[in-house]
Amino acid sequence: ALNYGFAKPDPRAPWQQPVTAPGPLAVRAELQHIMRYWLERGAAGFRVDMAHSLIKNDPGFRKTNKLWRDIRAMLDREYPDAALVSEWSSPIDAIGAGFHMDFAAQFNAPIFNPLFRAPGDAWGSHGYFNARGDGDALAPLEEYLRHYRATQPRGYISFQSANHDMARMSGGRTLPEIEVAMAFILTMPGVPFIYYGDEIGLRMPD
């Protein structure tokens, strides 16, 4: 595992190095080196898995925010067309930390789960977008608008059709249900993300 440091190290645990220790600083420098390597070869940007979790024992994400703001500053300076996308699932926090956009993903239950999942469904294949009409869009809409108003015009909220952690849109849905859900994802403000295979209606399992 890579050690980006601990915001509040426990002195009883010597492996918990502060973010200013030589090891974590070297890891950050290497991260930027790797990003430059791929950007020089034509990468359009980076999608960061669990972006909020790099620095440990960091209440309020103060040190985590600084890490990403430093990276955003490097991108703005050297690769201004590159996109920095987070799986933070809290657009207010992620965009405040310097990301261009954040997924309204499964971590953020108030937005994602009521729309695309239902309690008790092991595949997570239903939610508001199902023909039974037993979902409720009001609560996720209110939460979405809270994040939208707080982040405009600094960044974007992104809906995704699926990812490696959750079921495909096709799991347990009929074609009309998929069409309505995909139309929502593609027409909401922000930047939509289509999981590979969903563009051709790939069924589960894949």
Where are each of the predicted segments found?
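Hydrophobic residues within beta-strands of alpha/beta enzymes
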Residues: 46-48, 194
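Substrate-binding/active-site clefts of carbohydrate-active enzymes
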Residues: 1-41, 59-60, 67-71, 77, ...
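Conserved structural-core and active-site-/substrate-pathway-adjacent residues in large, well-folded domains
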Residues: 38, 48-49, 164
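A short, flexible beta-alpha/helix-coil linker loop
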Residues: 52-55, 165-167
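Conserved alpha/beta catalytic core and glycan-binding cleft of carbohydrate-active enzymes
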Residues: 72-206
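A conditional alpha-helix N-cap/helix-loop micro-motif detector
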Residues: 24-28, 64, 138, 174-175
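Short, solvent-exposed loop/turn segments at secondary-structure boundaries
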Residues: 58-62, 171-173
